[in-house]
């Protein structure tokens, strides 16, 4: 599986804000949503609420751009990943670093013996960044929006929750009852996919660049394709938000991100996959490198032509390969771990 790296520049160990951002990103908590009070419409234009001040805590974050930076969870699969990665959306449940399911917006759930009826209890007192309460009806509305819009895009939400499922919301009890036509071994796990992030559908005007969610940051402005976003702290978030403002800057390749970090243009970058750059940062006390195992797999392919057209020879080569040595070679640099098949 492919590793994910986050790099930050240290300043003599004195910067509190830079010490917090890595944990924030690894937890998938860095959220972005839009505008003020409940009932106001989402926007991608600058908000007057984010005035710079001398004591403002600002993070400059260099990252890759996917699908023109869209945060539309229903329209594009990358949109869901962007929204959660930037911190716009959260899901009912999430997977921790050990790939164990744990509550996020939900408090708990129960399921019947047939695994066709799930009752989810929401945490109390949660709000969207526009001030609206997170209710069972709001969650139902978000899922119905995915059902309505999903077929016209690439997000394919039906992979995680069938369109035949019925959803009943009880706002007084704070519960959501989901009934499916077929058994789901782990529906809560599937609802943890970024595509299933909970959005305030009613008050979001611009789903592509102004989605309203429940996380610690909200979109102050979308600065353009290839440029990035300006994010500000969500005043309605349930916990303390480490930064007042995050400048999310799109950077085209690994080298650009590495150079931006070295020059001080940014404080944090992600997914540096050049082994030489990673080693350079790891060897310096000025930077912190955090590497976590991802869920993406890489493959090496054999040419079936010529000598390797012999199946027995290919099998012999596969049996002789030392996968640990390859994964830890100078070329791979430990960014991959040896995989295996569930089949014998």
Model-assigned labels for residue ranges:
Residues 234-279:
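Ligand-site clamp/hinge motif
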Residues 55-65, 117-120, 139-142, 176-178, ...:
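Short, well-ordered beta-strand elements
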Residues 236, 270-344:
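Local pocket/hinge segments that shape ligand/substrate recognition
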Residues 62-111, 212-213:
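N-terminal lobe/hinge region of extracytoplasmic solute-binding protein
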Residues 189-241, 245:
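Gly/Pro-rich hinge or "lid" segments in bacterial periplasmic/extracellular proteins
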Residues 110, 114, 155-201:
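Surface-exposed binding/hinge segments that line
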Residues 107-152, 308-309:
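Aromatic- and charge-enriched surface segment that lines or borders ligand/interaction sites
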Residues 1-59, 100, 145, 166:
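Short, low-complexity disordered leader/linker segments with a strong preference
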């Amino acid at each position: 599986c492919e590793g994910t790296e986050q790099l930050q520049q240290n300043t003599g160990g004195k910067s509190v804000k830079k010490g917090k951002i890595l944990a924030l990103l690894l937890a998938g908590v860095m959220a972005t949503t839009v505008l003020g009070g409940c009932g106001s419409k989402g926007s991608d234009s600058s908000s007057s609420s984010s005035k710079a001040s001398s004591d403002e805590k600002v993070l400059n974050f260099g990252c890759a751009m996917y699908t023109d930076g869209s945060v539309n969870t229903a329209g594009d699969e990358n949109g869901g990943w962007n929204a959660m990665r930037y911190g716009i959306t959260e899901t009912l449940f999430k997977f921790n670093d050990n790939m164990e399911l744990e509550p996020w917006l939900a408090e708990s759930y129960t399921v019947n013996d047939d695994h066709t009826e799930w009752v989810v209890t929401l945490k109390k007192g949660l709000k969207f960044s526009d001030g609206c309460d997170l209710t069972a009806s709001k969650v139902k509305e978000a899922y119905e929006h995915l059902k309505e819009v999903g077929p016209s895009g690439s997000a394919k939400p039906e992979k995680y929750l069938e369109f035949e499922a019925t959803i009943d919301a009880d706002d007084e009890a704070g519960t959501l009852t989901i009934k499916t036509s077929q058994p789901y071994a782990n529906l809560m796990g599937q609802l943890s996919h970024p595509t299933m992030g909970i959005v305030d559908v009613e008050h979001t005007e611009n789903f592509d660049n102004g989605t309203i969610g429940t996380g610690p940051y909200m979109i102050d402005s979308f600065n353009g394709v290839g440029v990035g976003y300006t994010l500000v702290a969500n005043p309605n978030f349930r916990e303390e938000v480490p930064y007042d403002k995050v400048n999310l800057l799109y950077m085209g390749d690994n080298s650009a991100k590495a150079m931006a970090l070295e020059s001080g243009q940014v404080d944090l970058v992600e997914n540096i996959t050049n082994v030489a750059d990673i080693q350079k940062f790891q060897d310096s006390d000025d930077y912190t490198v955090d590497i976590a195992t991802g869920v993406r797999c890489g493959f090496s392919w054999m040419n079936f032509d010529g000598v390797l057209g012999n199946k027995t020879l290919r099998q012999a080569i596969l049996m002789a390969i030392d996968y640990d040595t390859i994964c830890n070679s100078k070329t791979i640099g430990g960014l991959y771990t040896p995989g295996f098949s569930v089949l014998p």
